């Protein structure tokens, strides 16, 4: 991974929309990691300090580091929970 772009913000602020548009604009070899996609659709877990989504997000970031030029990580990711 040559670059990591992190988009954080409140619910409904447009993070996912911006992240998808950015991925389309950059194009090839860009990985998008969505906190909600992992938490809600892949794992069906709640967000919180001990969320089971965090270890998978970390593994996906490691994968992106090895295999992608740019990784976009987007989600609410509260400071207290995702330090």
What does each of the following model-derived ranges do?
Residues 13, 17-69:
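Conserved substrate/cofactor phosphate-moiety recognition/catalytic segment
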Residues 71-75:
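Short catalytic-loop micro-motif centered on adjacent basic/acidic residues
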Residues 77-83:
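ATP-dependent NMP and nucleoside kinases share a basic, alpha-helical "lid"
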Residues 48, 76-77:
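Short coil/turn segments at secondary-structure boundaries
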Residues 10:
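P-loop (Walker A) phosphate-binding loop of NTP-binding proteins
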